[in-house]
Amino acid sequence: MKRKRRQDTKHAVYMLVNTNTNEAYVGITVCGNDVKNALKVRFQKHVRRAVTENKNWALCRSIRAHGAEAFVVLLVDIVRGRKPAHAYERDIINGDVPALNSH
């Protein structure tokens, strides 16, 4: 018999801040036990997408204009479960309206 998949995996809610413009982006990623590595890998994915996919999203434009070195990655919180993590992320985005959360 297959084990039931866990519904309460840990998610990191994070913020990317452009230190040149003080603009921010809020996102989430599954983090497991290695939060630091999960955030590093997720930021690398953002950078790779900005450079290779030529998306016209605010975050991608900012990464292309200022470079990855202009950004700092901040851990906002760790939330158990996908639905609560997404809800928490939406609450932050709707409350603060980060400039780089647009696509």
What are these regions (language model features)?
Residues 2-103:
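Structure-specific nucleic-acid interaction/processing domains
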